[in-house]
């Protein structure tokens, strides 16, 4: 069974857990887009593996980003190539297993599944660094935004039905708004 399939099975088998974001993780999300924070709170409720947000896992200033770039931790230097962290649109996470931090791929994959499912349930779109084709960043999740910078929203319940065109004098579509 592949890691992705294991993570899906693990996520599907997860019961309501007792995990909560710790004080430090909450503080590390300061400056992060509220939609992504909401997704993180939902993810901790459904994840099969506890997780936290490291000190550099939320919003980053240009100086913080450049420092991490020079340490070789990130490919974005913060100036020429900005990170989504600099706009508050990304979070990094780590697994918390047996009282210790873990960056094992199977743990991070399961947690990413919880983030994706949470975003879907809340009507948002996220992108996981583990899905990137050229560079795998397993502990990274980012909020997909519109060109204007707003969180991309999708319908929580998809439907194949055609939208109704508003007609005058039709009780199903006639309302106060103009066509």
What are these regions (language model features)?
Residues 81-179:
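Catalytic cores and adjacent binding grooves of peptidoglycan-active enzymes
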Residues 41-75, 121, 129:
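Extended, low-complexity, intrinsically disordered C-terminal regulatory tails
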Residues 75-81:
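Alpha-helical scaffolding within the catalytic cores
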Residues 13, 25, 29, 34, ...:
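Short linear motifs in intrinsically disordered/low-complexity regions
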Residues 2-54:
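Active-site acidic/histidine clusters and adjacent loop/turn architecture
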Residues 26-34, 59, 102-109:
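Soluble non-cytosolic domains of exported or imported proteins
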Residues 36-40, 65-66, 90, 112:
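A general structural signal for well-ordered alpha-helical packing
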């Amino acid at each position: 069974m592949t890691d992705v399939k294991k993570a899906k099975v693990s996520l599907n088998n997860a019961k309501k857990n007792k995990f909560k974001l710790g004080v430090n993780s909450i503080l590390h999300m300061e400056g992060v887009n509220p939609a992504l924070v909401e997704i993180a709170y939902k993810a901790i409720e459904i994840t099969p593996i506890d997780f936290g947000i490291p000190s550099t896992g939320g919003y980053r200033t240009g100086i913080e980003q450049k420092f991490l770039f020079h340490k070789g931790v990130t490919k974005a230097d913060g100036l020429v190539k900005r990170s989504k962290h600099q706009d508050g649109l990304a979070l990094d996470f780590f697994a918390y297993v047996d009282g210790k931090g873990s960056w094992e791929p199977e743990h991070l994959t399961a947690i990413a599944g919880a983030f994706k499912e949470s975003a879907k349930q809340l009507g948002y779109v996220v992108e996981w660094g583990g899905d990137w084709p050229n560079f795998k960043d397993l502990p990274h999740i980012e909020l997909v935004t519109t060109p204007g910078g707003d969180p991309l929203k999708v319908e929580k319940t998809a439907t194949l039905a055609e939208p109704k065109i508003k007609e005058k004098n039709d009780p199903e579509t006639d309302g106060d708004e103009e066509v």
